[in-house]
Amino acid sequence: MGKSINDILLEDFQNVVSELLIRNRSILDVLSKIQVSEGRVNRAVVKSVTHCGCISIDGKKQAFPNEASMSDLSGLVSTQVKGELCPECRQTIEKEIGGALFYLAALCNTLDISLYDVILKEKEALATLGNYCLR
């Protein structure tokens, strides 16, 4: 199976991260930066609710009828997000997700793991397990 342009872009991204990561190359720094960047993603989503208001969160217990099949469940479960991100919030969240991906790629580089291979293996596991791989 040949690699698509998206596969090549992912590997190229990991190579660029390797070239650019200078100051925080220690695995301890990388792990810390992953945690900080994930917090920034969460904070950006929260700000889109609390400061901008373009989206809201309608969090409540979700009902799972006993007679529902596995295929029915995907239609019954809600994201609990109402509305759509405005362009400014979307841009901010995308930027923060990019930062999180940067440090995830840095962790892969530090441990000599291919991010492409990780994603490919996860995709194959999901395809193999199907509904038995609920997350």
Where are the predicted features?
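Flexible "arm" and connector segments at domain edges
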Residues: 1-97, 101-135
